[in-house]
Amino acid sequence: LIMTASLLTACGNNFDERLKDEAEQLTKKHCPQQVDDITTLDSVVYDMERRTYVRYFTLAADAVPVAKENRLAVKATLTDELKNDASWKRVKDEKINFEYVYRDASNGTLAFTIRLEPADYQARQ
């Protein structure tokens, strides 16, 4: 997703505050955002206390059962994308957690959550 240069180059504020502000701006400017045929990004927040960058999605109702069934494959895909996305380098260097929360479009209930921790996305040494 979009990561503006201001996060990576801003001075003065502490990193967590900048990341929180960046998430709020992303939500205001770009959400909701259609990610693909079945997924909409609703909002992004940064939980400073948990040091977790959270993305909230809505899944098309007919896609929820298949997505839930393939949750491990979804996690693997998200992990690979994060590992290979250089724009998140500074955030990953700070050992931030990433959380992906998926809700059912038909009723708003939680479908599932995927959490990636530094051990998931950092290269094995």
Segments predicted by a language model, with ranges:
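Post-signal peptide N-terminal segment of mature Sec-exported envelope proteins
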Residues: 20-40, 44
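A mature extracytoplasmic/lumenal domain signature
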Residues: 57-61, 102-106, 116-118
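Short edge beta-strands and adjacent turn/loop segments
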Residues: 35-61
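C-terminal motif of bacterial Sec signal peptides marking the signal peptidase cleavage site
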Residues: 7-10
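A short amphipathic beta-strand at an alpha->beta junction
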Residues: 82-110
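Short, non-transmembrane amphipathic alpha-helical segments
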Residues: 65-90
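Sec-dependent signal peptide recognition
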Residues: 1-4
